[in-house]
Amino acid sequence: MRIALLTESAFPTARSVEGGWCDRLTRGLPEHEFELYALGATRRDPMPEPRPARLAALHHSGGTGGLSGLPAGGRFGGGLHGPRRRRALAAYRALVGALVQPAGADGFGPALYALADAGRGGGLPALLRSGAALDIVEAAWRTPGARGTVGPGSVGEPLVRDALVAVDLLERCLRPLSAPWYGPDALAAADVCHAVDGGLAVLPGLLAKHDHGTPLIITEHSLHLRERARGYRDAPYRWPVRALLLAFFRLLAREGYQQAGLITPGSAYDRRWQIHCGADPAAIRVVYEGTEVADRPGAGAEPPVPTLAWSGPIAPHGGLGTMLRAFADLRRELPEAVLRIHGEAPAGAGGYAERCRELAALIAPKDPDAVVFEDPSAEPGAVHRQAGVVVFCGTGGTAPRVLAEAMLSGRPVVATDVGAAREVVGPTGLLVPAEDPRALTAACAALLGDQERRSRLGNAGRLRAQELYAVEPAATAFRALYLELVSGWPGPDPVRQAGAAPAARQPFGRPADYWVAAGSRQARARDSVPVEAGAG
């Protein structure tokens, strides 16, 4: 089969998280042909080195700006005029209405496809940044009951600058509609579209399914909608803008879940979130993210002194403050204990990181080696080898793969009972409530004071992670899922090259459901009318 991998990022390398997953998938399924479509890549970007294995082709999004800069030239240039412009503005008006009106959510999908259809041939990004688009957003916010315009005082009152920001951000979100991927030699020729980690990467898959009937599978190792919602907590936008963008990603996720033939979350915890967001439980298959660390040896002998290794982002949701308070109490029981901190401060968290360093210096002022801040670029495995217990105490939940790689070191894990931690760690580690320094102190002291228990839990955790997160079971699962998806899907129409003779009919070349669905496809083509196509 020809598999189109869709990603929101730039071209991933084989060493990056996303590229590493693509590399493992393509190596594990040598019988298939894979092509990578990267929304964040432009024609100026160099090919990744090392590139993921067995990728037949890598496709950029066109222009020079990808998803992060202004497009220029190619399909992005030009303008929309006459009936196409009126159709595009009518579709955009319906799309924005679906975002701001709670009762209009069902109109999101039809408006999205109508907008993409009206923008064929170029000019859509320029129109979506125009004054006409600005007028549509401002008018939508003025309608009674518009989402995001209700709040205490002036919190929900949209300003002109809010409309300017919203139009710009929404245009960037809709830029995949103009990617040069929808011709007969690209997504139309794929047997399956596989969107990696959801989000905007789903948009090309939705259009390929809508236009060509290409089946879609969505893989989310961390729920994209949930991460977006967390990210917008500290975003520098006022409430009307945040509400509009969150509504877009929520409705995009719902449309993707409803149109996908199969959905593969990385944990049962994410599966529950997906069902809550509109996914059909029958379409969901949990596939744990494989990691090559499963084939490597464990960490070996423990350090001579009782040592904890903390991992996570040095930010309020990472839990380092809780860890330091717990470690201060632990030092009263184990004065020789050492804490090794491995993480870096994300953008905007520099002040928090500095306060954590000041607090760490107060824990043992006469012993500067009691708390060690590791180089953020150090390999996690190297940090695990220097500890007897690995601790994750963030409030936002640690990625299952990160927990699994810590367990694969053979060290016992202490983690806060949030997210997928209970599912991943199971009975092989200790779970504590979030933001509870006393419980964290007790768990760490219990393990550091019992070498036999540390060894038993560490070995059990390694075996559990090897069973769940080995590479081969993940590849085997996708081999079966691709076959399951294609076997139950009507085949696409054959792509005919210009000037070529019609292909001869192949007996039994298509399943019976293709011919049954052909009539309904023709009926939909006759009945489909673009939103307000005759307006103006």
Where are these regions (language model features)?
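N-terminal subdomain of nucleotide-sugar transferases
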Residues: 1-152, 489-536
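Nucleotide-activated donor-binding/catalytic signature segment of Leloir-type glycosyltransferases, i.e.
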Residues: 353-377
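Conserved acidic donor-binding segment of nucleotide-sugar-dependent glycosyltransferases
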Residues: 430-437, 446-452
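Conserved donor-binding/catalytic core segment of Leloir-type glycosyltransferases
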Residues: 293-331, 340-342
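A short, well-ordered alpha-helix in the C-terminal region of glycosyltransferases
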Residues: 439, 453-468, 474-483, 494-497
